[in-house]
Amino acid sequence: MKQAINKSKRSSRRRLPPIRSGEIIDYKNINLLRRFISEQGKILSRRMNRLTSKQQRLMTIAIKRARVLALLPFLNNEN
């Protein structure tokens, strides 16, 4: 019984959206794109990002464009 209460309480919490309403997903917005790639330079999954599927698609396209234009690295091998 206690677990059921905890689960319902946990699901009722609203998290802040990862992208604010004024932010535009664009390949030139490097600060925004860096929040959605790992330390190795990989694109984080949609579950980790808490993005909608449409936002994730736009984010992936923007990150790939930024990589091609050398605004973001393909890999981050600083070891």
Curated annotation (Swiss-Prot):
GO terms for biological process: translation. This is Small ribosomal subunit protein bS18c. Pfam families: Ribosomal_S18. It is found in: Plastid, Chloroplast. Signal peptide: none annotated. InterPro entries: Ribosomal_bS18, Ribosomal_bS18_CS, Ribosomal_bS18_sf. The gene is rps18. Keywords: Chloroplast, Plastid, Ribonucleoprotein, Ribosomal protein, RNA-binding, rRNA-binding. PROSITE patterns: RIBOSOMAL_S18. It comes from Physcomitrium patens (Spreading-leaved earth moss). GO terms for molecular function: small ribosomal subunit rRNA binding; structural constituent of ribosome. Part of the 30S ribosomal subunit. GO terms for cellular component: chloroplast; mitochondrial small ribosomal subunit. Its main location: plastid. The lineage of its organism: Eukaryota, Viridiplantae, Streptophyta, Embryophyta, Bryophyta. Belongs to the bacterial ribosomal protein bS18 family.
